[in-house]
């Protein structure tokens, strides 16, 4: 009995902060999504906010942009991180540490510093990207990467990718260290090709890490906000607006808290569904 009380005593602070700062806001957000909640009114409107949301062309545009970011970033992050980790793992300790530092640097660098660097790279007049492309005769005139609706979302996605691969690479390198080397050597002695060794031995061992990386990258892509706020503010013409940015715009710029919470509920449901699908697809073969 005493041990149970002590256990609950240690858990109490964590549970308190979880209830106050996570669970309660989630419940309140869901409840207020059924209200016309702003600085001047608090009126129950039922499903009107949800009906308005699905008829809102800006919401539709933001949803499409969000889906593009998720589909474009998750597979690339997983495959690129796996490739780099597999190449890095076989290097010596010094080279491995250097590559870890290089790829993890954007992760620990503040988002403001990252956006300042990329803003200079993308600058239409003095940016290094336009300079390199023009010098290589790939383009004939400067491109406004963040100001052109045809290029802005791709430019954001590239930044998102560069800041998302650091942690997965480190995780994959660590996971590769846990692969049973005797199984790999035995398979090679039996005449297995490198692809067979990877697919039959290494890949099953890397599945738990892959599942974690896929889910975390998906959530981060759905919640992409800081880059967009600092670089494009959702423009031009909402071409880079995501659900997270549109939620912020409605809540903190237009003070339409009820409608913003409706978008938040939809976003949470989308993340839950996609994560569940990923878990079912990748998790069935995971051995813990």
Predicted segments with their positions:
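A structural signal for multi-pass alpha-helical bundles of membrane permease subunits
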Residues: 3-288
